[in-house]
């Protein structure tokens, strides 16, 4: 069985983005029908990223538009060779034991090339507070980990109460399951990541702000005898010269 995918990374993991939600537009916020998200366009992008040597590709989730990330990743499993898939999972959207089964099945299809992005946003028609959503995500993660590492799920919390067999819901990665990525700045989210997740995702900030976030996460993870890696999601504009890139960015 494959070892945890993070252990095989040399230096930084350079990843790409699959436009599963609103499409692949020229400018942020634009909704050009020509670039509407589709299987044909998005699968082509991912196959190109695989051929170019990118380490991972984020497959985001949307509950209003776009394609289903789990189905998309399943379809791409036989069409790619090396690239990992970072599939976004919105906690509470799927029944946790069945979600564990789906992720384990995907991990076998990909032979360990699967990572999971934990999302805690609200679902349409619900209105949970941030604290409640992170509490629910905490329960979902614990159930997933039990499903992947034990033969019986025994869990009782505020949102879920299970006592059922988890055989043979075991992922290809026999070291606790796929790596968990997480992004969020609230205290509850930071603590959740420190205790359970493997990679903390951040957005463009000043260097002092990023350093502060990393120091906070490192210290909190140490309280759980854990270490957490870090990721940064940015939009990159590439042109032949810096001047051309800056001019395009100003449009």
Which sequence ranges carry the predicted segments?
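Acidic (Asp/Glu)-rich catalytic clusters
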Residues: 7-9, 46-51, 73-82, 103-114, ...
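Alpha-helical packing segments of well-folded alpha/beta enzyme cores
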Residues: 41-45, 49, 102, 140, ...
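Active-site nucleophile and cofactor-binding loops and adjacent substrate-binding regions
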Residues: 62, 66, 87-95
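Long hydrophobic segments that form regular secondary structure
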Residues: 173, 186-209
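Short, conserved secondary-structure transition motifs
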Residues: 232-246
